[in-house]
A protein has these predicted regions:
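Phosphoinositide system proteins, centered on phosphoinositide phosphatases
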Residues: 1-385, 414-545
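A phosphate-binding catalytic loop at a beta-strand-loop-alpha-helix junction
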Residues: 390-409
Length: 545
């Protein structure tokens, strides 16, 4: 569904108001009162109304408004870069944001409120620095191509030709909480409400008998968002940690568009892991008798959005993951009394041990009938020629490394079928084209790294296989370094990251509390030296032992 949002704007700052004047509608302005937070739209605006020498800047969009202890803040996109074009609409990646106080004199210097306000602002800034926020003025990134098209048909049947905020998929809308003040104003602010996703977007060009654009869009869920050991499993409503919808998008010329959607998410049971300075903390499974309830609600939600659901679990059947593998299998068997839900368990580490990565084809052949029956979505001359009526849901223990390997292999098979349909079977095997094969593998590996940094604090493991098709000694060494980096991040910094995410999403409001004051705001790159030192010490110990 096409959006009709305002583009970049001038932001004028007077002592009493913010004025946001769209570059594409210079006679209009959104006005925010800095004292009362009242929001209005002036349709006959002129800069002449403003004081001379008024402070101004150009912004790319509004993320929203956030209330903290001592004041209110306007959050805007101050810099972004073009990623590419999807469905003829530009897609942007956020590069820099600004948090602007409504009241410059919001607290007394040196007061306790000052300390907490500074801490909470640092938390917000740490989330906004996550290098994977995306938006578009013209295309709704919260929805897949299929959902967008279905909404377009529905709206046009009612004489509506642009979607409003009510069609955004709030599961993936990361600034929903920050847009509450705008929603209270009704439709007058619709064109200023920029849907803002966290995840990964990459757009590439290719050619094999025909020119095409190929994209990956990953949308991270908001309902149980968080960090690796702080956000595990499901809640009683069926929301799961690390829930991500990944869409592979294909455009051939002006007439053919296709997409295929997969999802990943934590094992949908009540379980968790508490950090205890071990590399692999013990898995605590809630003994609650109602373990099937969150699983049932999770499946109901998936069926509502996607249709048929097939579960693929890649965790170990023995050892550290053995008990939860058993519980998962038992509950999936019990849930069959409510739904017919295919469940495939593939012990990734056992089956692919000793570099036997070709054994992944065993899993792919097993689920191939479901991939084919679920289908993919395709449009030819704006007419539906295929629909996707189901979803493959993959997970490992983190739903990161093993999951991404399998998702990329499923995506490869689907893309072959889509290209074949687009070119009436004349294109041949797209993956015989070495340039595109390289692009495909590396883009899926980049997707893995982005999602892993968001959840675990480091790039993904096993991406050497995704990038090259085989395991390498270099890849094994990098996995060791990233594993140790995860250890440092998860044990020493993730509580702060979790609090920051919860504050950003509105899961708790800023107020003084016994939270520790963070020593510093850290990034992935600052953890690498610590991990290298640990890795060197472990290697020396093993060598000298």
């Amino acid at each position: 569904m096409d959006l009709n949002l305002h583009l970049a704007s001038y932001l004028y700052l007077t002592p009493s108001k913010f004025y946001i004047q769209p570059l594409d509608a210079p006679k209009e302005a959104l006005i925010i009162d800095r004292q009362t937070c009242e929001i209005t739209v002036n349709k006959i605006f002129s800069k002449d109304y403003l004081p001379k020498n008024v402070a101004s800047r150009i912004i790319d969009g509004i993320i929203g408004i956030k209330r903290l202890i001592s004041g209110v803040y306007l959050i805007v996109i101050s810099q972004s870069k073009l990623v590419g074009v999807i469905n003829e609409k530009p897609i942007y990646k956020v590069e820099q944001t600004s948090i602007i106080p409504f009241n410059e004199n919001r607290y007394e210097p040196g007061s306790g409120q000052n300390q907490w306000e500074t801490t909470y602002l640092a938390m917000l800034e740490s989330v906004l620095r996550t290098p994977s926020f995306y938006y578009s003025y013209g295309y709704d990134l919260t929805n897949s191509l299929q959902r967008n098209f279905e909404q377009t048909v529905e709206c046009q049947s009612r004489g509506v030709y642009y979607v409003g905020h009510q069609y955004y998929d709030r599961r993936f809308l990361w600034n929903q909480h920050l847009m509450i003040d705008f929603e209270r104003c009704g439709s007058i602010t619709d064109r200023y409400r920029l849907p803002f996703i966290l995840g990964f977007v990459c757009i590439k060009e290719g050619s094999i008998g025909l020119n095409f654009n190929w994209s990956i869009i990953s949308r991270r869920g908001t309902r149980r968002a968080g960090t690796r050991f702080n956000s595990r499993g499901a809640d009683f409503e069926g929301n799961v940690a690390n829930f991500v919808e990944t869409e592979q998008f294909l455009e051939c010329g002006e007439n053919f568009k296709a997409s295929h959607v997969q999802i990943r998410g934590s094992i949908p049971l009540l379980w968790g892991q508490k950090v205890n300075y071990r590399m692999k903390p013990p898995i605590d499974i809630n003994p609650h008798d109602e373990q099937c309830l969150p699983l049932k609600r999770h499946i109901e939600e998936l069926k509502k959005f996607y249709g048929d659901v097939s579960f693929v679990s890649l965790i170990d059947q023995r050892g550290h993951e053995g008990q939860i593998a058993y519980e998962y299998s038992q509950k999936m068997n019990r849930i069959q009394q409510y739904f017919i839900v295919p469940y495939h368990h593939f012990d990734f580490h056992k089956e692919c041990s000793k570099m036997r990565w070709h054994r992944l084809n065993i899993l792919l052949e097993k689920i191939q009938p479901e991939i084919e029956s679920q289908g993919y979505f395709a449009l030819l001359n704006n007419q539906v020629v295929n629909s996707q009526n189901g979803i493959i849901r993959s997970n490992c223990i983190d739903s990161l490394d093993r999951t991404n390997v399998v998702q990329s292999m499923i995506a490869k098979r689907v893309l072959e079928a889509q290209i074949d349909l687009a070119n009436n079977g004349l294109s041949g095997n797209i993956f015989l084209n070495e340039n595109f094969l390289y692009t495909f593998k590396n883009t899926w590996a980049d997707n893995a790294d982005a999602l892993s940094i968001q959840y675990a604090g480091t790039p993904a493991l096993k991406t050497d296989f995704t990038r090259t098709g085989q395991r390498t000694h270099y890849g094994v060494i990098m996995d060791g370094i990233n594993s140790l980096t995860r250890y440092v991040a998860n044990n020493f910094f993730d509580d702060y990251r979790q609090d920051a995410i919860d504050l950003f999403l509105g899961n708790f409001e800023g107020h003084p509390s016994p939270l520790y004051k963070p020593l510093s705001i850290i990034s992935y790159t600052s953890l690498v030296p610590a991990a290298l030192i640990l890795f060197t010490l472990v290697a020396l110990y093993l060598y000298l032992r």
